Amino acid sequence: MLHTLHRSPWLTDFAALLRLLSEGDELLLLQDGVTAAVDGNRYLESLRNAPIKVYALNEDLIARGLTGQILNDIIPIDYTDFVRLTVKHSSQMAW
């Protein structure tokens, strides 16, 4: 399943998101959701320990000035990769 987080993790039921993640799922951080990828925040460690791949939309990282502040565990992607993820996953959950 593809999960997309478009809101700030501080304004989302992040605990519920973590509970619903399963091995093989993928999470795309976009819009204000990219703030979850910033090194040192309280949500990042939970994401790093989850059995999933985490991506961040590069355009949103750039727009928020965060490109140099995310860990290597978070994979920056462009809109073409975003489309590939949506095609890959028949089911999706938006947060």
UniProtKB/Swiss-Prot annotation:
PANTHER family: PROTEIN TUSB (PTHR37526:SF1)
Main localization of the protein described in the UniProt heading: cytoplasm
Subunit structure: Heterohexamer, formed by a dimer of trimers. The hexameric TusBCD complex contains 2 copies each of TusB, TusC and TusD. The TusBCD complex interacts with TusE.
Name of the protein in question: Protein TusB
Keyword terms of this UniProt record: Cytoplasm, tRNA processing
One of the record's GO cellular component terms: sulfurtransferase complex
Membership in a protein family: Belongs to the DsrH/TusB family.
GO BP of this protein: tRNA wobble position uridine thiolation
Primary gene name: tusB
Domain of life: Bacteria
